[in-house]
């Protein structure tokens, strides 16, 4: 009689699918948190609560656009998504790193606009 361990069936290479799914969730969460930080900065700029030098603002916009592209590519049916974990990990790591770097630069350069009464 055949005994089947269902956990061993769902593997990619030598890595269990659960490990890949967990890594996927963590990377998506980190990328989304970095994007939320950028969104908060954009909200302050739009509300007129703060200002940024043009160069820093352009870098932040570029990093955010890369986030949107990566999100729309990997988190929808446009790509092979979950079936390309190496490509996903590489892309999301770069996008998250760039967002964090530009968020930190923007936070450092953020100038509060005086409140008009």
Please provide the spans of the model-predicted regions.
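Primarily the internal scaffold of c-type cytochrome electron-transfer domains
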Residues: 1-113
């Amino acid at each position: 009689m055949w005994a089947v361990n269902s956990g061993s069936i769902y593997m990619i290479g030598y890595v269990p699918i659960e490990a890949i799914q967990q890594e996927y969730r963590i990377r998506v969460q980190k990328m989304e948190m970095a994007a939320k930080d950028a969104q908060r900065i954009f909200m302050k700029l739009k509300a007129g609560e703060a200002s940024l030098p043009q160069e820093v603002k352009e870098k932040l916009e570029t990093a955010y656009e890369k986030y949107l592209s990566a999100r729309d590519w990997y988190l929808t049916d446009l790509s092979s998504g979950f079936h390309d974990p190496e490509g996903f990990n590489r892309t999301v790591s770069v996008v998250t790193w760039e967002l964090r770097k530009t968020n930190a630069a923007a936070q450092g350069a953020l100038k509060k606009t005086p409140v008009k009464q």
